[in-house]
């Protein structure tokens, strides 16, 4: 059964062309569809609190484990598919820098001596970033969490070293190579376009490995905390409040959704927070204690989680859901209606407006959303 699913998935993936969806730094929405098995989240329906977390753990915990490095299929191979540059399939997108880089220019490949420093190291080769640092709970390569590809991202070698084991939080100074990132002594702030991706990886990890088991069958529980944890190798990581905000500000895009599908094709487990972003509200947010149901994504939570971005904008507005036969109205701050437009099967709106602040009213089948947008 797993073999059939995997073959079907690969066929679907290979059908993509370079123009199907965008990279993280120029995101698209609504092109890549989630292929969630019909009953995948069924046992989580109607649950809340710890019961909901336990059900999600049971759903995603029994995944297929691949070796970290091997002559057979390993994490290097999977990442070259999951993080492939949609605009150049010979390349992959590196986390933090957003750089498109030849898949072969990686640690240990031996094929790119022209890029090496005098001591034989390749400071700009790519290696594997553990988004949840491996030293915070699973330091051994034989541990399942160590090789979980949901937690791995291709990264510039020197940038990976700079991030180290720092927590994620706002603030710091601009990094000299990953120029969209900020860092200080105890934290790392990724680029705006990847913030939500990072947050959802960490949300996955804290559900998947609560509890986790190392190669000696000793248990550990990963936990997100609301503070930074410098010089600490406990299985904790911060900063939860910042991660929740990043999850809100940077919604799931096509690149992230496609990555989830690729990894599911190999590991046979999914990231629930990519499939159902509203789960964050039920585990850490305003809906704690309320029963979650998968069908909520199709009703009131659509409008509650609907977002418009980027904001400020140069004139192109994106919605994080696809709009089909729904009306958009634009008003000045004085209440004058400037534009009314029917949106059909798209999530993008191009505006030709003077610089200023406007109110966008979205009249959808889920409800009405009023948003203040800055055009610059």
Task: Specify the residue positions occupied by each region the protein language model found.
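Bacterial Sec-dependent N-terminal signal peptides
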Residues: 1-21, 336
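Short, flexible beta-strand-to-coil junctions
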Residues: 96-102, 206-208, 363-364
């Amino acid at each position: 059964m797993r073999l059939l699913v995997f073959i079907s998935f690969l066929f679907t993936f290979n059908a993509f062309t370079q123009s199907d969806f965008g990279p993280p730094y120029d995101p698209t929405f609504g092109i890549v569809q989630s292929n969630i098995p019909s009953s995948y989240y069924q046992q989580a329906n109607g649950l809340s609190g710890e019961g909901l977390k336990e059900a999600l753990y049971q759903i995603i915990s029994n995944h297929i484990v691949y070796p970290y490095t091997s002559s057979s299929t390993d994490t290097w191979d999977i990442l070259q598919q999951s993080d492939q540059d949609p605009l150049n399939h010979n390349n992959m997108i590196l986390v933090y820098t957003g750089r498109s880089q030849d898949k072969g220019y990686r640690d240990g490949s031996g094929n790119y001596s022209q890029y090496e420093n005098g001591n034989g190291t390749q400071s700009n080769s790519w290696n594997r970033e553990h988004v949840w640092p491996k030293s915070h709970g699973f330091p051994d390569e034989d541990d399942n969490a160590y090789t979980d590809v949901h937690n791995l991202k291709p990264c510039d070698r020197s940038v990976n070293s700079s991030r180290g084991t720092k927590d994620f939080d706002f603030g710091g100074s601009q990094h000299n190579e990953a120029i969209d990132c900020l860092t200080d002594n105890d934290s790392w702030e990724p680029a705006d376009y990847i913030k939500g991706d990072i947050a959802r990886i960490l949300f996955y990890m804290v559900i998947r490995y609560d509890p986790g088991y190392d190669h000696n069958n000793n248990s550990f529980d990963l936990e997100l905390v609301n503070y930074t944890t410098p010089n600490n190798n406990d299985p904790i990581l911060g900063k939860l409040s910042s991660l929740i905000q990043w999850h809100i500000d940077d919604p799931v895009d096509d690149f992230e959704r496609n990555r989830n599908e690729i990894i599911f094709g190999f590991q046979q487990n999914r990231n629930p927070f990519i499939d159902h972003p509203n789960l964050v509200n039920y585990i850490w947010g305003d809906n704690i204690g309320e029963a979650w149901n998968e069908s909520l994504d199709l009703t009131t939570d659509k409008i509650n989680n609907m977002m418009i971005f980027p904001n400020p904008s140069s004139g192109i507005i994106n919605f994080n859901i696809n709009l089909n036969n729904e009306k958009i109205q634009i008003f000045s701050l004085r209440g004058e209606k400037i534009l009314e437009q029917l949106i059909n099967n798209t999530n993008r709106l191009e505006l030709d407006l003077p610089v200023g602040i406007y109110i966008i009213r979205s009249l959808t089948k889920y409800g009405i959303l009023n948003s203040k947008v800055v055009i610059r």
